[in-house]
Amino acid sequence: GKVCRLKKSIYGLKQAPRAWNARLMKDLKSIGYIPFMHAESIFWRYKDDIKVYLLVYVDDFLLITSAKSPKIISNLKDEIASFYTIKDLGQAEYFLGINLEHSAHSIKLSQSAYIHKILDRFNMAECKAVVSPMLSHDNLFDKRLATEKEKLLMLNVPYREAIGALMFLSVRTRPDIAVAVGTLAMHVQQPLPKHWEAVKRVLRYLRGSVDEGLVLCKVPTSEFNLRIYADADWATNSEDRLSRSGSVSQIGDSTIWWKSRKQTSIAASSCEAEYMALFESAKDAIWLRNLPCEFGFCPRPAPTTIFQDNQGSLLWPKQ
Protein backbone atom coordinates (compact mmCIF):
# COMPACT_ATOMS: atom_id res chain seq x y z
CA GLY A 1 0.00 0.00 0.00
CA LYS A 2 0.88 3.65 -0.29
CA VAL A 3 0.56 6.61 2.05
CA CYS A 4 -0.30 10.09 0.79
CA ARG A 5 1.19 13.11 2.49
CA LEU A 6 -1.30 15.98 2.73
CA LYS A 7 -0.14 19.42 1.71
CA LYS A 8 -2.40 21.05 4.29
CA SER A 9 -4.68 20.14 7.15
CA ILE A 10 -8.34 19.54 6.32
CA TYR A 11 -11.44 19.50 8.49
CA GLY A 12 -12.03 16.23 10.31
CA LEU A 13 -8.45 15.07 10.66
CA LYS A 14 -7.15 14.09 14.08
CA GLN A 15 -4.57 16.88 13.97
CA ALA A 16 -6.93 19.50 12.49
CA PRO A 17 -7.73 21.24 15.82
CA ARG A 18 -4.04 21.52 16.66
CA ALA A 19 -3.21 22.82 13.19
CA TRP A 20 -6.00 25.42 13.41
CA ASN A 21 -4.82 26.60 16.80
CA ALA A 22 -1.22 26.92 15.59
CA ARG A 23 -2.36 28.96 12.58
CA LEU A 24 -4.59 31.16 14.73
CA MET A 25 -1.83 31.83 17.27
CA LYS A 26 0.56 32.78 14.47
CA ASP A 27 -1.92 35.15 12.79
CA LEU A 28 -3.02 36.88 16.00
CA LYS A 29 0.55 37.36 17.19
CA SER A 30 1.44 38.92 13.83
CA ILE A 31 -1.02 41.78 14.51
CA GLY A 32 0.11 42.33 18.07
CA TYR A 33 -2.07 40.02 20.16
CA ILE A 34 -0.39 38.28 23.10
CA PRO A 35 -1.89 35.14 24.73
CA PHE A 36 -2.53 35.14 28.46
CA MET A 37 -0.07 33.12 30.49
CA HIS A 38 -2.83 31.48 32.56
CA ALA A 39 -5.46 31.09 29.80
CA GLU A 40 -4.06 30.72 26.30
CA SER A 41 -7.48 31.16 24.67
CA ILE A 42 -7.54 34.82 25.79
CA PHE A 43 -5.42 37.38 23.93
CA TRP A 44 -4.69 41.04 24.60
CA ARG A 45 -3.07 44.00 22.85
CA TYR A 46 -3.10 47.81 22.79
CA LYS A 47 -4.88 49.72 20.04
CA ASP A 48 -4.45 53.51 20.14
CA ASP A 49 -3.51 53.27 23.84
CA ILE A 50 -6.68 51.29 24.57
CA LYS A 51 -6.38 47.74 25.87
CA VAL A 52 -8.23 45.15 23.81
CA TYR A 53 -9.07 41.55 24.76
CA LEU A 54 -9.99 38.73 22.41
CA LEU A 55 -11.63 35.58 23.77
CA VAL A 56 -11.30 32.62 21.39
CA TYR A 57 -13.23 29.35 21.41
CA VAL A 58 -12.23 27.37 18.29
CA ASP A 59 -13.56 29.75 15.60
CA ASP A 60 -15.87 31.88 17.77
CA PHE A 61 -14.34 35.22 18.81
CA LEU A 62 -15.50 37.66 21.48
CA LEU A 63 -13.89 41.11 21.25
CA ILE A 64 -13.78 43.09 24.50
CA THR A 65 -12.71 46.73 24.62
CA SER A 66 -13.53 50.00 26.35
CA ALA A 67 -13.13 51.87 23.06
CA LYS A 68 -16.15 54.05 22.27
CA SER A 69 -15.10 54.97 18.74
CA PRO A 70 -16.87 52.85 16.08
CA LYS A 71 -13.85 53.41 13.85
CA ILE A 72 -11.45 51.76 16.30
CA ILE A 73 -13.79 48.81 16.79
CA SER A 74 -14.23 48.48 13.03
CA ASN A 75 -10.46 48.53 12.53
CA LEU A 76 -10.01 45.76 15.08
CA LYS A 77 -12.53 43.59 13.24
CA ASP A 78 -10.98 44.41 9.86
CA GLU A 79 -7.59 43.20 11.07
CA ILE A 80 -9.03 39.78 11.86
CA ALA A 81 -11.04 39.80 8.62
CA SER A 82 -7.78 40.20 6.70
CA PHE A 83 -6.97 36.59 7.65
CA TYR A 84 -10.39 34.92 7.69
CA THR A 85 -13.92 35.32 6.40
CA ILE A 86 -15.86 36.49 9.45
CA LYS A 87 -19.48 37.13 10.36
CA ASP A 88 -19.92 40.23 12.52
CA LEU A 89 -22.81 39.80 14.97
CA GLY A 90 -22.48 43.24 16.56
CA GLN A 91 -22.63 43.75 20.32
CA ALA A 92 -22.49 40.40 22.07
CA GLU A 93 -25.91 39.27 23.24
CA TYR A 94 -25.40 35.54 22.70
CA PHE A 95 -22.10 33.65 22.84
CA LEU A 96 -21.47 29.89 22.97
CA GLY A 97 -25.05 29.18 23.97
CA ILE A 98 -25.07 31.83 26.70
CA ASN A 99 -27.35 34.87 26.77
CA LEU A 100 -25.59 38.10 27.80
CA GLU A 101 -27.92 40.72 29.29
CA HIS A 102 -26.20 44.09 29.76
CA SER A 103 -27.20 46.70 32.33
CA ALA A 104 -25.46 49.79 33.69
CA HIS A 105 -23.69 47.96 36.51
CA SER A 106 -23.83 44.26 35.67
CA ILE A 107 -23.98 41.52 33.06
CA LYS A 108 -26.29 38.55 33.49
CA LEU A 109 -25.28 35.22 31.96
CA SER A 110 -28.12 32.77 31.41
CA GLN A 111 -29.21 29.95 29.10
CA SER A 112 -32.99 30.21 29.06
CA ALA A 113 -33.24 29.55 25.31
CA TYR A 114 -31.11 26.43 25.66
CA ILE A 115 -33.18 25.18 28.62
CA HIS A 116 -36.40 25.56 26.62
CA LYS A 117 -34.72 23.65 23.80
CA ILE A 118 -33.75 20.66 25.94
CA LEU A 119 -37.14 20.61 27.69
CA ASP A 120 -38.75 20.28 24.26
CA ARG A 121 -36.16 17.73 23.19
CA PHE A 122 -36.93 15.40 26.11
CA ASN A 123 -40.71 16.02 26.13
CA MET A 124 -40.63 17.91 29.44
CA ALA A 125 -41.83 21.32 28.23
CA GLU A 126 -45.13 21.02 30.11
CA CYS A 127 -43.84 19.15 33.15
CA LYS A 128 -44.61 20.17 36.73
CA ALA A 129 -41.77 22.21 38.24
CA VAL A 130 -40.02 21.24 41.49
CA VAL A 131 -37.94 23.36 43.87
CA SER A 132 -34.78 21.21 44.06
CA PRO A 133 -32.78 19.28 41.46
CA MET A 134 -32.16 16.23 43.64
CA LEU A 135 -33.61 14.43 46.67
CA SER A 136 -31.13 13.51 49.39
CA HIS A 137 -32.85 10.21 50.23
CA ASP A 138 -32.65 8.85 46.67
CA ASN A 139 -30.03 6.10 46.40
CA LEU A 140 -28.53 7.28 43.11
CA PHE A 141 -25.13 5.67 43.74
CA ASP A 142 -26.49 2.17 43.10
CA LYS A 143 -24.32 0.54 40.40
CA ARG A 144 -25.87 -2.92 40.39
CA LEU A 145 -26.44 -4.58 37.04
CA ALA A 146 -29.83 -3.93 35.51
CA THR A 147 -32.34 -6.77 35.35
CA GLU A 148 -33.67 -7.87 31.97
CA LYS A 149 -36.90 -5.99 32.68
CA GLU A 150 -34.98 -2.81 33.54
CA LYS A 151 -32.88 -3.16 30.39
CA LEU A 152 -36.05 -3.28 28.31
CA LEU A 153 -37.43 -0.20 30.09
CA MET A 154 -34.22 1.73 29.38
CA LEU A 155 -33.72 0.43 25.84
CA ASN A 156 -34.64 3.61 23.95
CA VAL A 157 -34.24 6.13 26.76
CA PRO A 158 -31.89 9.01 25.70
CA TYR A 159 -30.04 8.98 29.01
CA ARG A 160 -26.58 9.76 27.66
CA GLU A 161 -27.95 12.61 25.52
CA ALA A 162 -29.75 14.13 28.50
CA ILE A 163 -26.63 13.98 30.69
CA GLY A 164 -24.58 15.68 27.98
CA ALA A 165 -27.17 18.45 27.63
CA LEU A 166 -27.31 18.99 31.40
CA MET A 167 -23.52 19.04 31.73
CA PHE A 168 -23.41 21.84 29.15
CA LEU A 169 -25.59 23.86 31.54
CA SER A 170 -23.88 22.89 34.79
CA VAL A 171 -20.40 24.01 33.73
CA ARG A 172 -21.49 27.33 32.21
CA THR A 173 -24.24 29.13 34.09
CA ARG A 174 -25.99 26.68 36.45
CA PRO A 175 -23.79 25.61 39.36
CA ASP A 176 -26.98 24.73 41.24
CA ILE A 177 -27.34 21.48 39.26
CA ALA A 178 -23.66 20.48 39.31
CA VAL A 179 -23.94 17.90 42.12
CA ALA A 180 -27.03 16.24 40.67
CA VAL A 181 -25.59 16.07 37.16
CA GLY A 182 -22.21 14.83 38.39
CA THR A 183 -23.89 12.04 40.36
CA LEU A 184 -26.11 10.96 37.46
CA ALA A 185 -23.21 11.11 34.99
CA MET A 186 -21.64 8.13 36.78
CA HIS A 187 -24.33 5.89 35.29
CA VAL A 188 -24.18 6.66 31.56
CA GLN A 189 -22.92 3.13 30.79
CA GLN A 190 -25.86 1.32 32.35
CA PRO A 191 -28.50 3.59 33.89
CA LEU A 192 -31.41 2.20 35.85
CA PRO A 193 -34.99 3.49 35.61
CA LYS A 194 -34.56 5.38 38.89
CA HIS A 195 -31.61 7.26 37.39
CA TRP A 196 -33.78 8.36 34.47
CA GLU A 197 -36.44 9.53 36.94
CA ALA A 198 -33.73 11.56 38.67
CA VAL A 199 -32.72 13.10 35.33
CA LYS A 200 -36.34 14.10 34.76
CA ARG A 201 -36.38 15.71 38.21
CA VAL A 202 -33.43 17.90 37.18
CA LEU A 203 -35.39 18.88 34.06
CA ARG A 204 -38.45 19.68 36.19
CA TYR A 205 -36.26 21.86 38.39
CA LEU A 206 -34.99 23.70 35.31
CA ARG A 207 -38.59 24.13 34.15
CA GLY A 208 -39.23 26.20 37.27
CA SER A 209 -35.97 28.18 37.10
CA VAL A 210 -35.55 28.82 33.38
CA ASP A 211 -34.37 32.41 33.75
CA GLU A 212 -31.89 31.82 36.57
CA GLY A 213 -28.24 32.53 35.81
CA LEU A 214 -25.09 34.29 36.95
CA VAL A 215 -24.99 38.03 37.55
CA LEU A 216 -21.54 39.62 37.32
CA CYS A 217 -21.55 43.01 39.02
CA LYS A 218 -19.12 45.89 38.95
CA VAL A 219 -16.75 45.66 41.88
CA PRO A 220 -15.02 48.71 43.42
CA THR A 221 -11.24 48.39 43.57
CA SER A 222 -11.39 48.42 47.37
CA GLU A 223 -13.61 45.30 47.32
CA PHE A 224 -11.81 43.43 44.55
CA ASN A 225 -10.83 40.42 46.62
CA LEU A 226 -11.21 36.70 46.05
CA ARG A 227 -13.29 34.58 48.44
CA ILE A 228 -13.72 30.82 48.24
CA TYR A 229 -16.32 28.69 50.03
CA ALA A 230 -15.31 25.03 50.33
CA ASP A 231 -17.18 22.02 51.67
CA ALA A 232 -17.29 18.24 51.42
CA ASP A 233 -19.59 15.38 52.27
CA TRP A 234 -18.09 12.28 53.85
CA ALA A 235 -18.37 8.83 52.27
CA THR A 236 -21.86 9.51 50.95
CA ASN A 237 -21.30 7.21 47.97
CA SER A 238 -22.33 3.79 49.28
CA GLU A 239 -20.59 2.02 46.38
CA ASP A 240 -17.00 3.20 46.83
CA ARG A 241 -17.20 5.50 49.89
CA LEU A 242 -15.41 8.30 48.08
CA SER A 243 -16.37 11.75 49.35
CA ARG A 244 -17.27 14.72 47.17
CA SER A 245 -15.62 18.14 47.31
CA GLY A 246 -17.42 21.31 46.36
CA SER A 247 -16.39 24.95 46.15
CA VAL A 248 -17.67 28.32 44.99
CA SER A 249 -15.31 31.23 44.26
CA GLN A 250 -16.45 34.84 44.25
CA ILE A 251 -15.08 38.31 43.61
CA GLY A 252 -17.33 40.82 45.29
CA ASP A 253 -20.80 39.27 45.10
CA SER A 254 -20.17 37.65 41.72
CA THR A 255 -19.61 33.92 41.36
CA ILE A 256 -16.75 33.34 38.90
CA TRP A 257 -15.82 29.68 39.46
CA TRP A 258 -17.31 26.56 41.00
CA LYS A 259 -16.47 22.91 41.30
CA SER A 260 -18.20 19.70 42.40
CA ARG A 261 -15.97 16.65 42.12
CA LYS A 262 -15.45 13.22 43.65
CA GLN A 263 -12.30 12.89 45.70
CA THR A 264 -9.71 10.42 44.44
CA SER A 265 -8.94 8.69 47.73
CA ILE A 266 -11.07 7.50 50.62
CA ALA A 267 -11.17 9.86 53.59
CA ALA A 268 -10.94 8.16 56.99
CA SER A 269 -12.96 10.92 58.66
CA SER A 270 -15.07 13.97 57.88
CA CYS A 271 -12.05 16.07 58.88
CA GLU A 272 -9.93 14.43 56.17
CA ALA A 273 -12.67 14.90 53.57
CA GLU A 274 -13.00 18.58 54.43
CA TYR A 275 -9.22 19.04 54.42
CA MET A 276 -9.01 17.57 50.90
CA ALA A 277 -11.66 20.07 49.81
CA LEU A 278 -9.60 22.87 51.37
CA PHE A 279 -6.50 21.69 49.51
CA GLU A 280 -8.31 21.68 46.15
CA SER A 281 -9.67 25.16 46.83
CA ALA A 282 -6.19 26.44 47.70
CA LYS A 283 -4.93 25.20 44.31
CA ASP A 284 -7.84 26.95 42.59
CA ALA A 285 -7.00 30.15 44.47
CA ILE A 286 -3.53 30.34 42.92
CA TRP A 287 -4.93 30.32 39.39
CA LEU A 288 -7.91 32.53 40.23
CA ARG A 289 -5.64 35.17 41.78
CA ASN A 290 -3.32 35.23 38.78
CA LEU A 291 -5.89 35.34 35.97
CA PRO A 292 -7.53 38.69 36.91
CA CYS A 293 -4.05 40.25 37.11
CA GLU A 294 -3.62 39.61 33.40
CA PHE A 295 -6.76 41.69 32.87
CA GLY A 296 -5.19 44.39 35.03
CA PHE A 297 -7.48 43.80 38.02
CA CYS A 298 -5.28 42.20 40.65
CA PRO A 299 -6.99 41.17 43.88
CA ARG A 300 -5.78 43.02 46.93
CA PRO A 301 -2.46 41.71 48.27
CA ALA A 302 -4.24 40.33 51.33
CA PRO A 303 -4.40 36.52 51.49
CA THR A 304 -7.39 34.83 49.88
CA THR A 305 -9.92 33.73 52.47
CA ILE A 306 -11.23 30.17 52.12
CA PHE A 307 -14.33 29.58 54.23
CA GLN A 308 -14.85 26.16 55.82
CA ASP A 309 -17.21 24.77 58.45
CA ASN A 310 -15.13 21.90 59.87
CA GLN A 311 -13.14 22.92 62.94
CA GLY A 312 -10.84 19.90 62.77
CA SER A 313 -9.63 20.71 59.27
CA LEU A 314 -9.07 24.34 60.29
CA LEU A 315 -7.01 23.37 63.36
CA TRP A 316 -5.01 20.64 61.61
CA PRO A 317 -2.53 22.97 59.80
CA LYS A 318 -1.84 24.83 63.05
CA GLN A 319 -0.58 21.76 64.88
Task: Label each residue range with its predicted role.
Residues G1-Q319:
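Long, low-complexity, charge-biased intrinsically disordered regions
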